[in-house]
């Protein structure tokens, strides 16, 4: 067996920590080894928040920390606390590639800063700029990812949730146009109590209001499914929950369909080509029931509606942290297998 790829995580917030936990929970340690975490926060806080998580519970692996050294399940991980890519000596840690979970960097130029310092590839855990080499959405285009793609984005949690569903409908019935409302749990860029923020809506207490926010989801769909350019629009609101997101999808089909036909196609795909990525349920569930669910998207078949044979409404759920972190891990594992180390 070849040695595991040596990777670094830059940014150890909600997604960075979920990614590391998913790596161990899924048994991927033999193919991917985290050797460095860069996070400006104190080392003690890094270890504490890895051990204890308000949404996902206690981490099942033993975690210890001494100075700027973290040990997870016996694996040693170095800690650094920089804010700039160039300030980190990636070569000294023999890093093969970086999973960037900062939410700050995301352009080709940012990726090149890593490559110039000996990193072979970089994977952004958030939507990249249009100039990145590739945006990978598992279940849709991951087979097109090659070793020549050096600067890669994993898209967003909402793109990963909705694009596989859109592709299933488009392949089966054809899509003329669509509109999406993302009903997203509160995030770190919101306020606990009213406080200043450049976005005036996000100056308001996250636990007290449903808050509209900007989204570029429609443009993300176009990047993955370019033949649907100009056919989708999206809005988003944040709601007073800490995790799990619902997506309200409305599409106009190119051919007639019934509720039963639509649900059958989605159910079949969840059991076949999209098993592990798309799930389907008809249980009377609520958002908390999808907490720590590893799927990109879960279609609630009880909420499927059809008007005039072609206007379709669907409700899809996702754990916007855990589901996305699992897809990030899938992409990282694929990149590790492709990359010489």
Swiss-Prot record:
Substrate binds at residues 156-158, 202, 215-216, 238. It catalyses: D-erythrose 4-phosphate + NAD(+) + H2O = 4-phospho-D-erythronate + NADH + 2 H(+). Pathway: Cofactor biosynthesis; pyridoxine 5'-phosphate biosynthesis; pyridoxine 5'-phosphate from D-erythrose 4-phosphate: step 1/5. The active site is at 157 (nucleophile). One of its GO terms (biological process) is pyridoxine biosynthetic process. It is found in: Cytoplasm. It holds the Pfam family Gp_dh_C. One of its GO terms (cellular component) is cytoplasm. The record marks 184 as: Activates thiol group during catalysis. NAD(+) binds at residues 14-15, 320. GO terms for molecular function: erythrose-4-phosphate dehydrogenase activity; NAD binding. Keywords: Cytoplasm, NAD, Oxidoreductase, Pyridoxine biosynthesis. Its EC number is 1.2.1.72. InterPro entries: E4P_DH_bac (IPR006422), GlycerAld/Erythrose_P_DH (IPR020831), GlycerAld_3-P_DH_cat (IPR020829), GlycerAld_3-P_DH_NAD(P)-bd (IPR020828), NAD(P)-bd_dom_sf (IPR036291). Homotetramer. NCBIfam families: E4PD_g-proteo, PRK13535.1. Catalyzes the NAD-dependent conversion of D-erythrose 4-phosphate to 4-phosphoerythronate. Belongs to the glyceraldehyde-3-phosphate dehydrogenase family. Epd subfamily. This is D-erythrose-4-phosphate dehydrogenase. It comes from Idiomarina loihiensis (strain ATCC BAA-735 / DSM 15497 / L2-TR). The lineage of its organism: Bacteria, Pseudomonadati, Pseudomonadota, Gammaproteobacteria, Alteromonadales. The gene is epd.
């Amino acid at each position: 067996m070849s040695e595991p790829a040596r990777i670094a995580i830059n940014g150890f917030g909600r997604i960075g920590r979920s990614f590391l936990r998913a790596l161990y929970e899924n048994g991927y340690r033999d193919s991917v080894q985290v050797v460095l975490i860069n996070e400006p926060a104190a080392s003690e806080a890094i270890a504490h928040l890895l051990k204890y998580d308000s949404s996902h519970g206690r981490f099942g692996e033993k975690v210890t920390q001494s100075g700027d050294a973290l040990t997870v399940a016996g694996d040693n991980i170095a800690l650094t606390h920089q804010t700039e890519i160039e300030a980190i000596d990636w070569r000294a840690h023999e890093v093969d590639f970086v999973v960037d979970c900062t939410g700050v960097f995301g352009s080709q130029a940012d990726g090149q800063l890593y490559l110039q310092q000996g990193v072979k590839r970089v994977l952004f855990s958030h939507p990249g700029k249009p100039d990145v080499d590739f945006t990978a959405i598992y279940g849709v285009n991951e087979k097109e990812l090659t070793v020549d793609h050096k600067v890669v984005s994993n898209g967003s949690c909402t793109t990963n949730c909705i694009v596989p569903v859109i592709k299933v409908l488009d392949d089966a019935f054809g899509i003329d146009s669509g509109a999406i409302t993302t009903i997203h749990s509160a995030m770190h860029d919101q306020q606990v109590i009213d406080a200043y923020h450049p976005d005036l809506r996000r100056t308001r207490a996250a636990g007290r209001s449903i808050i509209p926010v900007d989204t570029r989801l429609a443009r993300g769909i176009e990047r993955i499914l370019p033949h649907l350019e100009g056919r989708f629009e999206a809005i988003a609101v944040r709601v007073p929950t800490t995790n799990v997101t619902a997506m309200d999808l409305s599409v106009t089909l190119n051919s007639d369909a019934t509720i039963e036909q639509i649900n059958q196609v989605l159910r079949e795909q969840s059991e076949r080509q999209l098993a592990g990525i798309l799930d389907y349920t008809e249980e009377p569930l609520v958002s908390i029931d999808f907490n720590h669910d590893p799927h990109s998207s879960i279609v609630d078949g009880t909420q499927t509606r059809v008007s005039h044979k072609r206007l379709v409404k669907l409700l899809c759920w996702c754990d916007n942290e855990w589901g996305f972190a699992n897809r990030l891990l899938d992409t990282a594992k694929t990149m590790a297998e492709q990359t010489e180390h």
